[in-house]
From Swiss-Prot:
Residues 219-362 form the Peptidase S30 domain. Coiled coil: none annotated. This is P3N-PIPO polyprotein. Belongs to the potyviridae P3N-PIPO polyprotein family. GO terms for cellular component: host cell plasmodesma. It comes from the Viruses. The active site is at H270 (for p1 proteinase activity), D279 (for p1 proteinase activity), S313 (for p1 proteinase activity), C706 (for helper component proteinase activity), H779 (for helper component proteinase activity). It comes from Turnip mosaic virus (strain Quebec). A motif (Involved in interaction with stylet and aphid transmission) lies at residues 414-417.
């Protein structure tokens, strides 16, 4: 019960009057003034208690009992009386239990007063310069206070808390409590009220009378928990075991030795490779645990500056043991994180983002590296060793070699650098192919020279280097294998073809493809074991090769995704990369200058007229019909040159088109169009808009490069993502190999090369191709058509059909036709070019005619090599000055040809020192390897002259070996006889050439004085004629000698 102190006028008589009350105090609450109330005083004996009615504010009156008569007497004598209801006082005031409605009204009044006080408090606290309810004050990273708005989520939570607080009832300390005493052995008042309130539910069930056993919960105080933690830490430290504290934030602890003392180490974020502003998340409970942990971490010895270094990350120490400058710590312990500007930082405090990147962490990275190295090395090393391992190599050298091997396999600046990993994935930068090969060679040499005992490391690097050098650049053999194996469907030739396609890929081939290559090789081995040959024959009389009237279906041109709304083909990125074709192998037509200069398409041994002039269309129908007539060429019948055979059967796709009667189909006039690519050789042609390189520009292929239209047609079927690589391969690799006017065989080989890397081009349609058997040229018709008519039509329609020309067993003259031609071959014939005797005669004619020899060498730079047949021709070639004249020309024109001529000059000097023809021939034979090497450096098209020179040099090389054996055995008589016959014949040819020169000189020597004397006698006397003639002859003789000397000096 609360103590009540009040002052009132109390009388001992029965009176009813209004009196003014004083102050009333409840317990320790401040006194409260009382309003005027009616006090009823009853006269009672001194021993009887007195009743008082007290009213507080608007509350119901409360009846208060007073003490006995002695107390009343005292109160009458004192104006103010203090009554305490405790039992220790003389009198007790007992407040009777009010009704329940009164209690509710008391609660309502209290809530109203509390709300009023809260409003007053809020109004008094509100300042015009303060913050709003939806704002808060935060501290920035630089230590500056800043007002920021609260989030909508935070405001929602705040309003929810206020609602819950308002709904809670207010329990006053003076609220009456129900008595727990029973009256007459019955239930107490509190039990009766609780029984009235409780609802028996459900009504239809009988409650169980079984008493439930409730076990007492085992509880431990905070002090007991701390004692338990200390005991566990002490045990784990002794055993060096790991601890994991599970709270709001888990903490993992282990024990390590530093400075001969065992410390506790916490796993912080940067030990896991993470850089965060707060390295360790810890609350109050975690900090308390860390404080306990610090008592058992170390031995309390002072840690001087410089002791804490790499490897101390996460170690827990006491604050007072550190003497170095340090940051603040949220508790008594200090968790070491790192150092920044000579200041240690605790892992639990939050630092700025910039500092988190600059701080030097004290993690032992090397230890972590070797920890992972040892773990994986021991886990994955092989167990099938037949010996017992022991330490026989120097550990330091092992580490150095391991570092070199790591750099060879994984070139990097740091093994933990993610950018170096990206370079290795993309094979770029320091991990590019050439860079790795160069670096690999350097490191291998270092291991060989500095670590001779590590031979196995050198072997591993050798194998690795071999795997990197996996680019297959043997294009010539690839083409020859393709020509031999493609199209032969019998025996092992299909397997040879597929094996060739896999080998050309090199390192880009997958393991599955290599497995397939082994299977193909097995089939080839079986074929070689059981070899069979079948001969089939075909008759030209029964040859029919009709062209299909149905157009070839090209899926690329039918795909809606590659067509615009008008149905035209969309080049996309292919059009952009097609610039590599148009800028290098096409020239721009200027319509302002007219089309006349482009009407005649000149080839080395002929010409063909284009229909480009027909782009100007007249409006007169008669003139227009007259314009649609072509200019026929001389017709050519169906011969063996028109067909291609494979094992006796006709390969119709590689033949000329015929009618049903067997006559050749002659080409008609092909009308021109602008800005189009025309493809399709069967049925109606297809017109594809050229890519928009430059607006309203017309392009025509340069002379010798009309076959570029084939690659441009293949580009239609190439994926956009591969267009760049496709055009680069064509420009840099294939066109440099093909050159001008290549053969159809070379063009077909180039198409197969592209098919290997870009399979989608196999069904690409080709432009129209016309065959001119007279000039042995195949014309690739572009969008400007052909005014010349009467050519044969080649049936080849797709790239796959064109590749059939590469088959080695294909008997065809067409594959040797030029897509154009060469001047040397067309002027002199392939048979003469392939004959060494004809070539050396041609060289002999040019020995004393340097201008003619220079023109011949422009077409055939290998012509001087035929002088190797005769030592006399080499000496004449050297003594005449023609060799020196050609050297001076080719030093600036072609250095590779100049090198060949220098080798010939040195050979001529060696030959001149020997008198015997046989000895001279032996000198020539010993110089053959040098000449062959010099010839290999000369770049030129694979024409008839080049192939003839290759065969000639191969013949000399193969003759030199048995001749050397015969000479050592003494069998030289027959050879001497044949050489002498050849030398006499060639010497006669050289002599006739020299006689011509002498005859011209003699004529000049005789005619000059006669003409001069005649001119002199016309003006002067006859007596002086003979004397003047002698003087003129002498002057002419002197001049001729001076000119010869000057010419020799200039040649030198």
């Amino acid at each position: 019960m609360a103590a009540v102190t009040f002052a009132s006028a109390i009388t001992n008589a029965i009176t009813n009057k209004t009196t003014s009350t004083g102050m009333v105090q409840f317990g320790s609450f401040p006194p409260m003034p009382l309003r005027s109330t009616t006090v009823t005083t009853v006269a009672t004996p001194v021993g009887q208690p007195k009743l008082y009615t007290v009213r507080f504010g608007s509350l119901d009156p409360v009846i208060v009992k007073g003490g006995a008569g002695s107390l009343a007497k005292a109160t009458r004598q004192q104006p103010s009386v203090e009554i305490d209801v405790s039992l220790s006082e003389a009198a007790a005031l007992e407040v009777a239990k009010p009704k329940s409605s009164a209690v509710l009204r008391m609660h309502e009044e209290a809530n109203k007063e509390r709300a009023l006080f809260l409003d007053w408090e809020a109004s008094l606290k509100r300042r015009s310069y303060g913050i709003a309810e939806n704002e808060k004050v935060v501290m920035t990273t630089r230590g500056v206070s800043k007002i920021v708005p609260r989030s909508s989520r935070a405001m929602k939570q705040k309003r929810a808390r206020e609602r819950r607080r308002a709904q809670q009832p207010i329990i006053l300390k003076w609220e009456p409590k129900l008595s727990g005493f029973s009256i007459g052995g019955g239930f107490s008042a509190s039990a009766i009220e609780a029984e009235e309130v409780r609802t028996k539910w459900p009504l239809h069930k009988t409650p169980s009378m079984k008493k439930r056993m409730v076990h007492k919960t085992c509880k431990m105080s905070d002090q007991g928990v701390d004692m338990l933690i200390r005991s566990l830490v002490k045990i784990f430290k002794a055993k060096s075991a790991n601890i994991e504290y599970i709270g709001k934030k888990p903490i993992k602890v282990d024990f390590i030795r530093k400075e001969r003392t065992k410390f506790a180490r916490i796993q912080v974020a940067h030990l896991l490779g993470k850089r965060a502003q707060r390295d360790l998340l810890a609350g109050m409970e975690e900090n308390h645990f860390i404080d306990i942990l610090s008592e058992y971490s170390g031995n309390g010895t002072t840690i001087n500056p410089g002791v804490v270094c790499a490897g101390w990350s996460g170690i827990v120490v006491r604050n007072e043991t550190l003497t170095q400058k340090r940051s603040r710590s949220p508790s008594k312990a200090f968790v070491i994180r790192g150092e920044h500007e000579d200041k240690l930082y605790d892992a639990r405090i939050k630092i700025t983002k910039t500092m988190s990147l600059k701080i030097v962490h004290f993690s032992a990275r090397g230890a972590n590296f070797w920890k992972g190295f040892d773990r994986c090395f021991l886990a994955y090393r092989s167990d099938n060793r037949e010996h017992t391992c022991y330490s026989g190599l120097d550990v330091t050298e092992c580490g150095e070699v391991a570092a070199l091997m790591c750099l060879a396999m994984f070139p990097c600046g740091k093994i933990t650098c993610p950018d170096c990993v990206i370079d290795s994935e993309l094979s770029q930068g320091q991990a590019s192919g050439p860079s790795m090969k160069h670096r690999l060679t350097q490191l291998r040499d270092v291991i060989k020279s500095s670590y001779p005992r590590f031979k196995h490391a050198v072997q591993i690097l050798d194998r690795y280097e071999q795997s990197l050098s996996s680019a297959n650049e043997n294009y010539q053999d690839f083409a020859e294998i393709q020509s031999i194996s493609d199209g032969v469907e019998k025996a092992a030739f299909p397997h040879v073809n597929k094996l060739n396609a896999i080998l050309i890929k090199g390192a880009t081939a997958t393991g599955e493809e290599f497995s397939q290559a082994t299977k193909h090789l097995l089939e080839i081995a079986r074929y070689l074991k059981n070899r069979t040959e079948n001969i089939e024959k075909g008759s030209l009389k029964s040859f029919r090769n009709k062209v299909s009237q149905k157009a070839h279906i090209n899926p690329t041109l039918m795909c809606d995704n590659q067509l615009d709304k008008n149905g035209n083909f969309i080049w996309g990125e292919r059009g952009y990369h097609a610039k590599r074709f148009f800028s290098n192998y096409f020239e721009i037509i200027d319509p302002k200058k007219g089309y006349t200069q482009y009407e005649t398409r000149v080839v080395p041994n002929g010409s063909r007229k284009l229909a480009i002039g027909k782009l100007i269309v007249p409006t007169n129908f008669e003139v227009l019909r007259e314009q649609m007539r072509g200019e026929p060429v001389e017709p050519y019948p169906v011969t063996v040159e028109c067909v291609s055979k494979s094992q006796g059967d006709f390969v119709h796709a590689c033949c000329c088109v015929t009618t049903e009667s067997g006559d050749p189909v002659l080409s008609e006039i092909k009308m021109p169009t602008k800005h189009h690519l025309v493809i399709g050789n069967s049925g109606d042609p297809k017109y594809i808009d050229l890519p928009e390189i430059e607006e309203n520009k017309m392009y025509i292929a340069k002379e010798g490069y009309c076959y570029i239209n084939i690659f441009l047609a293949m580009l239609v079927n190439v994926k956009e993502s591969q267009a760049k690589e496709f055009t680069k391969v064509v420009r840099d690799k294939l066109v440099s190999e093909l050159g001008k006017w290549p053969t159809l065989l070379d063009v077909a080989t180039a198409c197969y090369f592209l098919k290997v890397f870009y399979p989608d081009v196999a069904n690409a349609e080709l432009p129209r191709m016309l065959v001119d058997h007279k000039t042995k040229i195949i014309h690739v018709v572009d969008s400007y058509g052909s005014l010349s008519t009467g050519y044969h039509v080649l049936k080849t329609n797709t790239v796959e059909q064109l590749i059939k020309f590469t088959r080695c067993n294909l008997e065809s003259s067409l594959k040797h036709y030029r897509v154009g031609g060469t001047e040397w071959e067309n002027a002199h014939g392939a048979d003469n070019i392939d004959n060494p005797q004809w070539c050396i005669k041609r060289l002999v004619k040019g020995v004393y005619r340097p201008k003619q020899l220079k023109e011949d060498m422009l077409a055939n730079p290998f012509l001087p090599l035929y002088a190797l047949l005769s030592p006399g021709v080499i000496l004449a070639f050297y003594n005449s000055g023609s060799l020196e004249h050609l050297m001076n020309h080719y030093i600036s024109a072609d250095s590779n040809v100049a090198v060949l001529l220098v080798v010939l000059k040195s050979l001529a000097k060696k030959v001149s020192t020997s008198q015997s023809v046989l000895a001279q021939l032996q000198i020539i034979e010993r110089s053959l390897p040098e000449l062959i090497e010099a010839k290999a450096n000369i770049n030129g098209p694979d024409d008839a002259a080049t192939r003839a020179c290759n065969r000639f040099m191969g013949m000399l090389l193969h003759m030199a070996e048995p001749n050397y054996e015969l000479a050592n055995g003494g069998y030289t008589f027959l050879r001497d006889h044949s050489i002498s016959i050849l030398e006499k014949k060639l010497s006669a040819d050289l002599g006739r050439g020299m006689e011509r020169v002498k005859l011209v000189g003699a004529l000049c020597y005789k005619i000059l004085p006669v003409k001069a004397s005649n001119l002199y006698t016309e003006r002067f006397a006859n007596a002086k004629r003979s004397r003047f003639r002698r003087q003129i002859q002498r002057v002419g003789h002197i001049l001729l000698r001076v000119e010869q000397t000057a010419s020799k000096r200039s040649e030198r």
